């Protein structure tokens, strides 16, 4: 059933979000229109501001309203000499939430995927190489996803970084804390056994 053109447009716009199907989009639209008009207006205002004012950090490519994000503006972070390479800004948030990393990041905004037209240029690897030649970087931690594309991307970046006398490491992959072995896939188990450490 079709509603008014504006309601249909709102539902279709909400469907553009990842994981939102037609029923979920319809429920969200009706909730905003029936009960949450103030929330809807605030959402529209926040979305408009974010779309017009949020860009990418000129150093690491994560989201920011400034030329440099707060992490890249921190002398404490710069002085560590460590850059962690991740695929998305969401990866930065996940690592920051853990509170165990105090260096800087470089966000690829994807991974190598020649079939999709994503090569080194699209990932900003020229900018990453400029960081490596600046003598400010002593270690590069590769934290790409444990997928075929993520591994290929990590190997490509490692080959590039070796030319600059930088220590290169890859984050460990394995069984999650609190996970039960019977539910872990065979590839993850293999990585866990291969990456085991002495006690």
Curated annotation (Swiss-Prot):
Residue ranges the record marks as coiled coil: none
Cystine bridges: none
A Pfam family recorded for this sequence: RecR_HhH
Stored InterPro entries: DNA_Rcmb_RecR, Rcmb_RecR, Rcmb_RecR_Znf, TOPRIM_dom, TOPRIM_RecR
Keywords, comma-separated and alphabetical: DNA damage, DNA recombination, DNA repair, Metal-binding, Zinc, Zinc-finger
BP term (GO), one: DNA recombination
Toprim domain residues: 81-176
Zinc finger (C4-type): 57-72
MF annotations from Gene Ontology: DNA binding; zinc ion binding
Family the UniProt entry places it in: Belongs to the RecR family.
PANTHER family: RECOMBINATION PROTEIN RECR
Stated role: May play a role in DNA repair. It seems to be involved in an RecBC-independent recombinational process of DNA repair. It may act with RecF and RecO.
Protein name: Recombination protein RecR
Organism whose genome encodes this protein: Shewanella frigidimarina (strain NCIMB 400)
Classification of source organism: Bacteria, Pseudomonadati, Pseudomonadota, Gammaproteobacteria, Alteromonadales
Gene: recR
